[in-house]
Amino acid sequence: IKPLAGGEFDADLLAIVDPVEGWEAKDYVNKLGAFFEGHSIYKDKVRRYSHCVTIEYAGERRIDIAPCVRGRQWPDTYEVCNRASNTFETTAALDYTKWVIGRNGVAGGNDLKKVTRLLKYLRDIKTNFTRPSFLFTTLVGLQIHDWDKDTAAFADTPTCLKTVVGRLDDWLQMNADLPEIRNPVLRSDIQSRVWDQTKYSNFRGKINLYRGWIDEAYAEQDRDESIGKWQRIFGDNFA
């Protein structure tokens, strides 16, 4: 899905590195930034953020590279580096990626990946609710269970979209107050911390609204009417 005008194609890269004696958390990000800033190709395209170095190129493309230190204190542990606070933060990024891939495998046809992209696109074109991509990925993934594999609820991408948004809306409507939404592979990571009650309530209301629109578009038998109803959700260029 091409980003909206002024938007960017972006990619996230986790760079697994061994610990360097004497380095603090900020050093890993700063050294990575300095490396690219010293390169003739990248020097004018680099920006440093709290956890990553960003390279912007080709006008509408960017890549975020985050150093992740392996085994600094204990074997098989991973930590990302917060340059702003100069602290190491435990992460389970590799396990989280495996979890997402597993949920996508249950849905089949790469449909979870497609649905997640559609919902992120919906966020970007409507601009009336906010949620970080990692939190939405978790919320979507939690709606898919092992027993869903090869069921009619995930027969194709539109059906997967209807099923996932319907289940998500059902869960949201049962939780009027902001719940704790934890990383499914790192229980100490409360991902919902990025929301307050106001943002959560707005998200809850918008998903309920769009759930109704999706159900209506999905059920429409007339082709032209169906296209019009999908365009109400995803914009006039969606067909």
Give the location of each predicted region:
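Charge-biased C-terminal accessory regions appended to nucleic-acid-, cytoskeletal NTPase
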Residues: 212-239
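Extended, alpha-helix-rich binding/interface surfaces that flank or overlap catalytic cores
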Residues: 3, 61-117, 187-190
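Second-shell loop/turn segments in exported
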Residues: 21, 105, 126-127
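Extracellular structured ligand-interaction cores
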Residues: 8, 12, 50-52, 60-64, ...
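Short amphipathic alpha-helical segments
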Residues: 24-31, 111, 160
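Conserved nucleotidyltransferase catalytic core and NTase-mimicking acidic/glycine-rich helix/loop elements
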Residues: 113-216, 220
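Conserved catalytic core of two-metal-ion nucleotidyltransferases
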Residues: 29-78
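Active-site nucleotide-donor binding segment shared across nucleotidyl transfer reactions
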Residues: 1-22, 26
